[in-house]
Amino acid sequence: LHLERTKVTVDRRGYIETNEFLETNAEGIYALGDCNGKAPFRHKANYEADILSHNLYLRTEENDWRFAEYDLVPAVTYTYPQVGHVGMTKEQAEAAGYTVSVGLHHYSQTSKGYSLGMMEGKVDDGFIKVIVEKKSGKILGAHVIGEQASILFQPFLNLMNAGKHLLRAIHPEIGSEQTKVLRAKKYVRNLEPNVISTINETMVPHPALSEVAMWT
């Protein structure tokens, strides 16, 4: 990239430092995807590209800004069986101070799983585990091992992403004048659960058939 010819700074690993609006420390230069070191997934790059295109070209209202958050980046391992997850594990949630409830359900305990020949105790009997804050019922994490895992945890990801999002500074030292204004006013973006834009602003793991529904 010949960054030495610019004023763009990198971290100790060599990744370009970006803030929540994908800005670098050089005015007018943005960075997204693997080069900023924030989760090396195609769907994370898609998410960042959507944010940039919205803010730079598609925004129609003055107070309509999108910003990046990285605590709900889904991941899928396309092995047999598939493994998919988003959010916290039970151990991570408890370490963060949450009192949690854990729900676990096997494929074989459903009619569809049984009709597919999945039986309790067999190696192909997948399961989904959901981590919830006990008091509020807030979903903290969803984890699936089994057939089509990449699809099965998408509804939880959608629900986890819905609601009010308070702007949180990433690299506070990086920021345009507009970014500083939004930080100072504690900008909030509200993603209603029954509005199509909320689906559009939720990550979907790539490649997964859930992209068919999420990109409609």
Regions found by a protein language model. Name each.
Residues 28, 73-74, 140:
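Short amphipathic alpha-helical segments
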Residues 32-94, 151, 205-216:
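A conserved FAD-binding loop/helix module that cradles the flavin
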Residues 15, 74, 99:
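A residue-level signal for beta-strand positions that form part of recognition/binding surfaces
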Residues 23-24, 69-70, 120-124:
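Solvent-exposed alpha-helices and their adjacent loops that cap or buttress functional pockets
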Residues 1-62, 155-158, 169-172, 183-190:
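FAD-site-proximal beta/loop scaffold in flavoenzymes
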Residues 6, 74-75, 128:
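Small-molecule pocket liners
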Residues 79-89, 94-216:
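Flexible, glycine-rich terminal cap/loop adjacent to redox cofactors
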Residues 11-13, 72, 125-127:
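Short beta-strand-initiation
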